Amino acid sequence: MQYICKKNKMTNLIVGTVAFDAIETPYGKTDKIVGGAATYISLAASFFTEKLNLVSVVGGDFPKSAIKMLHDHNVDTAGLQIKESEKTFFWSGRYHNNMNSRDTLETQLNVLETFDPIVPKQFSDSDFLMLGNLVPSVQQKVLDQMTKKPKLIVLDTMNFWMDHFLD
């Protein structure tokens, strides 16, 4: 595939959910599919950036083929923790007609409930940091591990964290 723009060489650290999703829209419905903010941030960014670093956690039920897909997009998964005896985070939601609003139908935290992000040393000086949809205390732990202030920090959140972990 030929790119319209040249990929930048800056490093990007992406921390967030690598998960399973089940999604309903007015146009269709999926069962359990590979999802998660960090998954899709990584895949989208891979078209514009050469160096992508991922920190997340999955259970032993997460498909190796999905991890290979990340590798195929030059995503370094040295920071991906795999907890073999546990289940991967799962989210289910229904999107409304305008596709801007949605209702959460189910959230199973699973491995995310005890996720302690460990930023590998080689990731700690990344130029950009994308903190995906995670509990704010986990996002703060990532910030505390950065050895160099990123040029840009992007933060995502969701009503679940605000409703349950506002402290």
Q: What are these regions, as identified by a protein language model?
A:
Residues F128-D167:
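Conserved beta-alpha-beta core of the PfkB/ribokinase-like small-molecule kinase fold
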Residues G28-L43:
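Short catalytic helix/loop segments, enriched in acidic residues and glycine
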Residues D21-K32, T49-M130, D144-P150:
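Conserved N-terminal subdomain of the carbohydrate kinase-like
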Residues T17-V18:
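Active-site metal-binding loops of divalent metal-dependent hydrolases
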Residues N8-L13:
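Extreme N-terminal starter segment of soluble prokaryotic enzymes
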Residues T39-N53:
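A short, N-terminal amphipathic alpha-helix
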